[in-house]
Structure formats: C-alpha cells, structure tokens
C-alpha cells in the first residue's frame, strides 16, 4: 500500500542564462523543461544541464517556483 504523502512532485526547470541576460519573455521566450523529483532524496532546488534552444548550447536549468 502507498504511504501518506506522495514523494514525487512536478518541477519546472528554467534556463538561468536566458533569465540572467534579460530575454524578453513575450517575443523570444525562455527555455523551460518539466520533470519530476523525489522530495525525500533531493530536498534542495534541482539544477540540471539541459539544451537551451534559445542559447543554442547546453546550459544550467534551475528549478523555479510555480
């Protein structure tokens, strides 16, 4: 049987380089990925290297608040 709370939560990863450069969100947009993480194994914010189609390279994508 399942335990009380679900450990897996859905998180959104956003390109930190696009945000830092101040890209206009309406016209160009910011690269975002949706993934899941286990709250018990990784309680801190998640950071992964993913491909950013706006920057045309692999950059660090950090977890943002919903």
From Swiss-Prot:
GO biological process per UniProt: translation
GO molecular function: structural constituent of ribosome
Gene3D superfamilies: Ribosomal protein L33
GO cellular component terms attached to this protein's record: chloroplast; ribonucleoprotein complex; ribosome
Subcellular location: Plastid, Chloroplast
Pfam family, one: Ribosomal_L33
Key words of the record: Chloroplast, Plastid, Ribonucleoprotein, Ribosomal protein
NCBIfam families: PRK00504.1 (NF001764), PRK00595.1 (NF001860), rpmG_bact (TIGR01023)
Similarity field: Belongs to the bacterial ribosomal protein bL33 family.
UniProt-recorded name of the protein: Large ribosomal subunit protein bL33c
Species this chain originates from: Cucumis sativus (Cucumber)
Encoding gene (name): rpl33
């Amino acid at each position: 049987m399942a335990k009380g709370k679900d450990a897996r939560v859905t998180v959104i990863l956003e390109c930190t380089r696009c945000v830092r450069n101040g890209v206009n969100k309406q016209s160009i947009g910011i690269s975002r990925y949706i993934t899941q993480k286990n709250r018990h194994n990784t309680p801190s914010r998640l950071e992964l290297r993913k491909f950013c189609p706006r920057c045309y390279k692999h950059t660090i994508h950090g977890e943002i608040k919903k």
